[in-house]
């Protein structure tokens, strides 16, 4: 049996539908909004047009069946790892993962594929970053804490609206003495650079893109 499925060979939506107590399908195509709903794998009504729209795309919402699964609560860390892997294989596709239970958002946006991947090509926010709801950098704060245990306590006591928490390992690297290639190959340094959002180096560094104007 699989602990985590990496793919269902093209029949994923059918399997998800069969294992869900409810599934809603909304399709934007040919200027119209099409919708259909299923319960326990069976259609509630035929595919119907419910409105007009100029954009295209598909939205699938599903509720895992408690009759099939003993655990129906999603683990956001597992989802984040899987979507990060998918971002490597789908260059140019922007993937956004939102956990509305704790106002957490991950963004995976890889401009190039695996053939040109480097340590800093991954523009997705770090998986351990508990981001804040505030989008204005001037009002946003980033707290760097040592270790996951401290990170857990900090996340519980923070103000989610304006305070972000990023757990890091202690004494990660002396970047003043390290070579540049060793510095960017450090997972912790790369995580910090990605979280700050302003890049590194003469060509990529842009202080205007700094995501937090207060870093503690």
From Swiss-Prot:
One of its GO terms (molecular function) is DNA binding. Belongs to the type II topoisomerase GyrB family. This is DNA gyrase subunit B. PROSITE patterns: TOPOISOMERASE_II, TOPRIM. Pfam families: Toprim. Heterotetramer, composed of two GyrA and two GyrB chains. In the heterotetramer, GyrA contains the active site tyrosine that forms a transient covalent intermediate with DNA, while GyrB binds cofactors and catalyzes ATP hydrolysis. Its EC number is 5.6.2.2. It catalyses: ATP-dependent breakage, passage and rejoining of double-stranded DNA. GO terms for cellular component: cytoplasm. Keywords: ATP-binding, Cytoplasm, DNA-binding, Isomerase, Nucleotide-binding, Topoisomerase. It comes from Acinetobacter bereziniae (Acinetobacter genomosp. 10). Few gyrases are as efficient as E.coli at forming negative supercoils. Not all organisms have 2 type II topoisomerases; in organisms with a single type II topoisomerase this enzyme also has to decatenate newly replicated chromosomes. InterPro entries: HATPase_C_sf, Topo_IIA, Topo_IIA-like_dom_sf, Topo_IIA_B, Topo_IIA_B_C, TopoIIA_CS, TOPRIM_dom. It comes from the Bacteria. GO terms for biological process: DNA topological change. The keyword Oxidoreductase does not apply. Residues 140-216 form the Toprim domain. It is found in: Cytoplasm. A type II topoisomerase that negatively supercoils closed circular double-stranded (ds) DNA in an ATP-dependent manner to modulate DNA topology and maintain chromosomes in an underwound state. Negative supercoiling favors strand separation, and DNA replication, transcription, recombination and repair, all of which involve strand separation. Also able to catalyze the interconversion of other topological isomers of dsDNA rings, including catenanes and knotted rings. Type II topoisomerases break and join 2 DNA strands simultaneously in an ATP-dependent manner. The record marks 171, 174 as: Interaction with DNA.
């Amino acid at each position: 049996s699989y602990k985590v499925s990496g793919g269902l060979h093209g029949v994923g939506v059918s399997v998800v539908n069969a294992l869900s107590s409810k599934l809603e399908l909304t399709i934007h195509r040919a200027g119209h909004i099409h919708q259909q709903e299923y319960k326990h794998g069976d259609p509630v009504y035929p595919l119907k047009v419910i409105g007009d729209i100029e954009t295209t795309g598909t939205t699938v919402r599903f509720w895992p069946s408690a009759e099939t699964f003993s655990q129906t609560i999603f683990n956001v860390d597992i989802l984040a790892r899987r979507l990060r892997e998918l971002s490597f294989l789908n260059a140019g596709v922007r993937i956004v993962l939102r956990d509305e239970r704790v106002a957490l958002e991950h963004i995976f946006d890889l401009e190039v594929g695996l053939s040109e991947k480097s340590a800093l090509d991954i523009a997705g926010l770090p998986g351990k970053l508990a981001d804040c709801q505030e989008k204005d950098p001037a009002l946003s704060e980033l707290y760097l804490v040592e270790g996951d245990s401290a990170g857990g306590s900090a996340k519980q006591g923070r103000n989610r609206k304006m305070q972000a928490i990023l757990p890091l390992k202690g004494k990660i690297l002396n970047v003043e003495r390290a070579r540049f290639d060793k510095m960017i190959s450090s997972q912790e340094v790369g995580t910090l650079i990605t979280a700050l959002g302003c890049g590194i180096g003469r060509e990529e560094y842009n202080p205007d893109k700094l995501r937090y104007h207060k870093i503690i």
